[in-house]
């Protein structure tokens, strides 16, 4: 990353959630989850500016309460990527890159954001984080997207299926010992002109098959660079996730 590259980090946050309504406002160690995420992002030196993108009065009020910056967005966005683009447009200030940080990962580490920022150069269109898979449960879990990369670190394909298939090893228990598999971590960096383009694309066949929005970009010919992190990411999707992580950290 060039030292003069400017980056705005946008944290999309919705109150409505099928599995965990209101989760941005849940308390974790004395702070709301959205403040936990905001504080972690703000402490990353490479980030020029941080803001929350939300369609909810309660989340907006909470961000203003702890002194954060917030942009109101429309409620009907199909993805965090679309919400980020609207927020960036309303910011009305140019940046070299936008990083989309998930609003339900209160334990995101600044080092992970630094790792992603570290591969950003003017010729990068899109970028994301990946991590080596260490256990069989993750390897074969369809809720954990896997990724294949080429020799230049660009994503070839993302899938909920375990990829690649090791034909020479019929016993899948041998797979981790014989190949390095990577999982995708859903933090994205976009060049602004590319973000404007990908939000105009229609859903693609592969995206609909796998339910992974990044496949739309690959199918349309965009390049997604990857950065490898060694840090595990813990997202909170359900009340059970919250109980597990707070119990572990206490």
Swiss-Prot record:
GO terms for biological process: CMP-keto-3-deoxy-D-manno-octulosonic acid biosynthetic process; lipopolysaccharide biosynthetic process. It is found in: Cytoplasm. It catalyses: 3-deoxy-alpha-D-manno-oct-2-ulosonate + CTP = CMP-3-deoxy-beta-D-manno-octulosonate + diphosphate. Pathway: Nucleotide-sugar biosynthesis; CMP-3-deoxy-D-manno-octulosonate biosynthesis; CMP-3-deoxy-D-manno-octulosonate from 3-deoxy-D-manno-octulosonate and CTP: step 1/1; Bacterial outer membrane biogenesis; lipopolysaccharide biosynthesis. It comes from the Bacteria. It is an enzyme of class 2 (transferase). Keywords: Cytoplasm, Lipopolysaccharide biosynthesis, Nucleotidyltransferase, Transferase. GO terms for molecular function: 3-deoxy-manno-octulosonate cytidylyltransferase activity. Belongs to the KdsB family. This is 3-deoxy-manno-octulosonate cytidylyltransferase.
């Amino acid at each position: 990353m060039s030292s003069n590259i400017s980056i705005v980090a946008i944290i999309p946050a919705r109150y409505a959630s099928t599995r965990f309504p209101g989760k941005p406002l849940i308390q974790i160690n004395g702070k709301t989850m959205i403040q936990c995420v905001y504080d972690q992002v703000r402490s990353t030196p490479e980030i020029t500016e941080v803001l929350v993108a939300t369609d909810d009065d309660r989340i907006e009020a909470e961000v203003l309460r702890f002194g954060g910056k917030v942009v109101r967005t429309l409620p009907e966005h199909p993805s965090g990527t679309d919400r980020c683009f609207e927020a960036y447009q309303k910011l009305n200030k140019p940046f070299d890159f936008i990083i989309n940080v998930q609003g339900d990962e209160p334990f995101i580490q600044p080092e992970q954001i630094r790792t992603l920022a570290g591969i950003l150069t003017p010729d990068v269109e899109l970028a994301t984080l990946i991590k080596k898979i260490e256990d069989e449960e993750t390897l074969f879990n369809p809720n954990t997207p896997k990724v294949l990369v080429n020799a230049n670190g660009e994503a070839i394909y993302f899938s909920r299926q375990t990829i690649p298939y090791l034909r020479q090893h019929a016993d899948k228990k041998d797979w981790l010992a014989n190949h390095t598999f990577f999982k995708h971590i859903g933090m994205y960096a976009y060049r602004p002109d590319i973000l404007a383009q990908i939000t105009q694309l229609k859903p693609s066949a592969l995206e609909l098959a796998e339910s992974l929005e990044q496949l739309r970009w690959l199918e349309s010919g965009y390049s997604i660079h990857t950065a490898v992190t060694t840090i595990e990411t813990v997202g909170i999707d359900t009340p059970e996730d919250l109980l597990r992580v707070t119990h572990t950290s206490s």
